[in-house]
Amino acid sequence: MSNLKLTLACWDYDRTRPLIDGRVKPEGIDLDIRIMRPREMFPRMLEKKEFEVSELSLGSYVTLKGRGSCPFVAVPITLSKIFRHSCIYVRTDAGIKTPQDLRGKRVGTTQLGSTGTVFMNGMMQHEYGVALEDIHWFIGGLDSPTSRPVIALNLPEKVKVDFLSSNQTLEGMLEAGQLDALFALYIPSIFQKGSPRIARLFPNYSERERDYYRRTRIFPIMHTVVMREDVYRQNPWVAGSIYKAFCEARDLAVDGLYDTDALRLSLPWLISHLEETWRVLGKDFWAYGLKPNRPALEAIGQYVYEQGFSPRAVSPDELFVPDM
C-alpha cells in the first residue's frame, strides 16, 4: 500500500531540519514540507486550513479549544519554547524601573492574543500583580503597519486598547515617546542599534528566567503541531507517526549540539551554554509529550481564560490526541 501524502508547514529549526532534509521520515507518510515563518504560516492555517499538518500558535489553539470552535487536533509536540523576560522594552525616561511601574502606562504589542504576549501578561499578573486592565494597550505592527488579529480578541470592556493607524508602527511610537514600553516577540531594531532611550525592563533577564523556572517549572511553550480534524478522523494513526518522527528529529538535533570536535552552531561557548541548560532544565530540556510540559500547559490554559480570550480555562488533558 502506498504512503499517505500530507502537507506539513513548519519553520526551519534545528529540530525540524532532519525532517526537511529527509534523514527522518514518518512511517507510512510522504510529507510535502512547506518551510515558512510562523507569521505567514499561522494566518494561512487559521483562516484557510491550508495544510493537513502545521506548526501553530499554542495560544490560538487553546483559545479555539476554549471557545468550542477548534477545527484542529494537536499532537503533544512543543515545537517552539522560549522564556519571554527579555522581550519587554521600556523607554529610559518613562519612569519604569519595576514591573509594577507599568500600571497606567502606554504599552505596545503586535497582538494581545499571541502566545508570547499571553505568557508575558500571565507572568506580569501572577509574579508582579499587574493585570491586563492595568495597562493602556496599543496594537499594531512592530516595524511596518499590519492588519488586525486573525482570531477576534473578545476582550473585556475594562481592558483599554487602541489600534495603530495605517501609517504608524510600534517602534516609531516608542522612539517618538508616544509609547512608554513595548512587549515585542522580535528584538526591535532601535534596541539592536543601541538607542540610549530604549532598555530592557529586566537587564538581568537570564537570571530572572532561571529563577522563574526553578520556582514554577514553567518553560513557556509558544507553538505546537496540529492536524486538520478531518485528516485525523480519517487516519488517526497519523498522529502517532508524526509524533514519533518529530521526536526522532529533535533527538538528532539535540544530540548534535554536544560535540567539541566541530561546533554545530556558530556560538563560541555553545558547550558551556548546553551544560548550564542541563543544570537548570535537565538533560531532557526540550521534552515533548503531555507530562513534562504540564506546568506550562496549565499556565497557558489559565492565562487565556483570565485575559478574556476564552470563556473557560482549558485543561492540558483536553489539548492533545489521547494515549500519547
Question: Which ranges hold each PLM region?
Answer:
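Immediate post-signal peptide segment of exported/extracytoplasmic ligand-binding proteins
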Residues: M1-T7, I96-R106, V280-L281, E306
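Extracytoplasmic "Venus flytrap"
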Residues: L6-T16
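Short, well-ordered beta-strand segments
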Residues: T7-A9, G108, F138, L182
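Short, glycine-/small- and polar/acidic-enriched structural segments
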Residues: D14-E133, W137-S144
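Short helix-initiation/N-cap motifs at beta->coil->alpha
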Residues: R34-R44, K97, I135-P149, L153, ...
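Pocket-lining segment of extracytoplasmic ligand-binding domains
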Residues: R148-Y258
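Secondary-structure end/capping motifs
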Residues: V226, V231-E306
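Short hairpin/turn module used for nucleic-acid contact or packing/dimerization
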Residues: A296-M324
